[in-house]
Design a protein with these regions (language model features):
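Catalytic core of non-heme Fe(II) oxygenases with the double-stranded beta-helix
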Residues: 76-151, 156-170
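Non-heme Fe(II)/2-oxoglutarate
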Residues: 1-80
Length: 170
């Protein structure tokens, strides 16, 4: 599925969602808020480099990297993508995310780890395009696109994983 915009937004389903959810939702549900993190996310937020020691998270990150088409070379050099930041967001009642973007990164992503269709959408602000949450769905988008998450209005939490992708010389 593609969202109509001037830029490609990749939407897909992670085939190993149940395994990932089973392993990390219990960790994130009891995650303490990180008070010193400067973020547009007005919800519980993990560290910026969270989950690097968890096998199912490593597998997920690798999968996302493989979903992004990249130029093979630029200016004579060959590049590959790497995940620069990776964090979890735990939205509880009345939590939200302010309008923002992820510049200067190349691409960013959101993964709906725990959500229902009626939870707050991911909204691409300038287009008014709403992406309804569904467990297992990922959304990969150019980092410069403005986006936000409206207030979460339910008792049960909504949990997402997010990250930024950038180039490195191979």
């Amino acid at each position: 599925m593609k969202v109509k915009s001037r830029y490609d937004i990749i939407i897909g389903e992670y085939p190993f969602h149940k395994e990932l959810k089973k392993e990390i939702v219990p960790l994130l549900e009891k995650y303490p808020d990180q008070p010193n993190i400067n973020s547009n996310v007005k919800a519980t937020h993990t560290e910026w480099d969270w989950g690097g020691d968890i096998a199912s998270v490593k597998k997920f990150r690798k999968y996302i990297l493989n979903e992004v088409p990249i130029p093979i070379s630029r200016g004579g050099a060959t590049y590959s993508l790497y995940c620069r930041d990776f964090w979890g967001n735990i939205y509880r009642k009345n939590d939200y995310t302010d309008d923002h973007n992820h510049s200067p990164y190349y691409m960013s992503f959101v993964y709906f780890l725990k959500a229902t269709w009626y939870n707050s959408s991911l909204v691409f602000t300038h287009y008014g395009q709403k992406i309804r949450p569904r467990e297992g769905k990922y959304v990969i988008f150019p980092s410069h696109l403005q986006h936000h998450v409206p207030k979460h209005r339910f008792r049960k939490s909504r949990i997402t994983l997010s990250g930024n992708l950038n180039f490195k010389e191979s």
